[in-house]
Regions:
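N-terminal hydrophobic or amphipathic helices and topogenic motifs
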Residues: 2, 9-13, 18-21, 29-34, ...
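Short loop->beta-strand "edge-of-pocket" segments that line small-molecule binding or catalytic clefts
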Residues: 141-151, 243-262
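Ligand-binding cleft/hinge of the Venus flytrap
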Residues: 157-165, 243, 248, 261-281
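Short helices/loops that flank or line small-molecule/ion binding pockets
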Residues: 160, 177-191, 195-196, 285-300
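Short beta-strand-to-loop elements that line the ligand-binding cleft
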Residues: 168-175, 276-288
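A ligand-binding cleft/hinge motif common to bilobed small-molecule-binding domains
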Residues: 194-208, 293-322
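Periplasmic-binding protein-like
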Residues: 214-226, 316-345, 364-372
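Flexible hinge/capping segments at coil-to-helix
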Residues: 222, 231-252
Length: 372
């Protein structure tokens, strides 16, 4: 039996009550009070309650079990997802098993709350792409999870529906080029992409064909979305087309190299023979559709290239430029995973499609169709 913490003597003396007086109130002898204070006698429930009442405290203030030592965290070595920001000891990470190795992905930070995580980086910093992590749940092997790299905010809707089906989706925020590179390196199960080939006008398939051996990757449509110019609410700068981005009174926020939205902007600037040096803010980047739209909403930029859904989240204006497919590229050896099969089934569910379309700018009629 664990030793009981006993504060009876301390509290009695603090109240200025003699052992004899307390003994009378509790219905015991003075010797019993001394024995309890010495820890050689444990009172029954009735005596403990009378003692607490006499001293005007709770029973647990008098007698308590010592606090259990915290369970030690399990230490594991994990592969740091390439392209992650520099890690520091104690940084939260999410974990997923991909091709039998444990991959650590730092969740995207949100200023208002701690990110959902499975472990923290240990004091030993990453070396050769690997790092030690301290795992919270010793019983979790992180196998019933899918690690997906992509930039479509709508993937969070898919994650919510998958969670209801018992599958966890871990999202690593990357642009299209970065996502395909991670898939090629075997670091993720799925890469989300929207890269338009300028010569053919086709989306995603040409780039995937260049990067991967034939028949090694399946391509599934996630949705067709609208991309365009996101403006401040009410469009105070009267921006109507790409040409207006070269005006001196207009400032944009761009996307990073490799992003489909940046490629869309560049192709339009090239078509119109506009030098990017004449576009104010061209070299300032935001890592994502929602982040770019937030820059506009907060007044840090007059416009950006993003999706209609991103504009709608912040109540911003939107000028459509094109509709394009956002596809999911999956290594064929992963197609038979039960979790992947659940994901593909979810893409065809009407309740999921309705929710995604309600965000604005999404057409899900082709969702779940296999293109390759």
């Amino acid at each position: 039996m664990p030793e009981i913490e006993n504060h009876l003597g301390t509290l009695r003396q603090k109240r200025g009550i003699s052992a004899a007086e307390l003994a009378r109130t509790a219905g015991v002898t003075r010797q019993t009070i001394y024995a309890m204070e010495a820890g050689s006698y444990i009172p029954n429930t009735a005596v403990a309650l009378r003692l607490a009442q006499a001293l005007e405290v709770k029973v647990e203030d008098l007698f308590a079990l010592p606090q259990a030592e915290p369970v030690g965290l399990r230490s594991e070595e994990a592969t740091l997802l390439p392209g992650s920001d520099a890690l520091h000891p104690g940084q939260p990470v999410q974990l997923c098993r991909v091709n039998k190795r444990l991959v650590a992905s730092p969740p995207s930070p949100v200023p208002w709350y701690f990110p959902v995580s499975d472990a923290v980086v240990a004091s030993k910093l990453p070396k050769n792409g690997r790092t030690d992590v301290q795992v919270f749940d010793a019983g979790d092997d992180f196998r019933n999870r899918i690690l997906i790299a992509g930039c479509d905010p709508g993937i969070s809707v898919l994650a919510h529906h998958l969670q209801s089906a018992g599958v966890e989706l871990v999202l690593a925020h990357r642009n299209s080029s970065q996502s395909l590179k991670l898939l090629k390196e075997g670091c993720v199960h799925i890469a989300g992409t929207h890269l338009r080939d300028e010569s053919s006008g086709e989306t995603n398939l040409p780039e995937i064909g260049r990067m991967f051996p034939r028949n090694s990757v399946a391509v599934i449509t996630f949705a067709v979305w609208e991309e365009g110019i996101v403006t401040a609410t009410g469009n105070p700068k009267s921006i109507k087309a790409i040409e207006d981005l070269a005006r001196r009174d207009v400032t944009i926020v761009n996307r990073e190299k490799g992003a489909g939205s940046r490629a869309l902007l560049d192709s339009n600037l090239k078509r119109l023979k506009i030098d990017s040096k004449n576009v104010k803010g061209y070299d300032r980047v935001a890592p994502g559709h929602l982040q770019a739209a937030w820059h506009v909403q907060s007044g840090q930029a007059d416009c950006c290239i993003a999706t209609r859904a991103a504009a709608r989240v912040f109540g911003l204006g939107f000028i459509p430029l094109l509709s394009e497919r956002y596809d999911l590229a999956i290594r064929r050896q992963h197609l038979d995973m039960p979790s992947i099969q659940t994901l593909l089934d979810t893409l065809n569910r009407s309740n999921y499609r309705r929710e995604l379309e309600s965000l604005g700018g999404y057409d899900t009629r082709a969702a779940g169709q296999r293109l390759l």
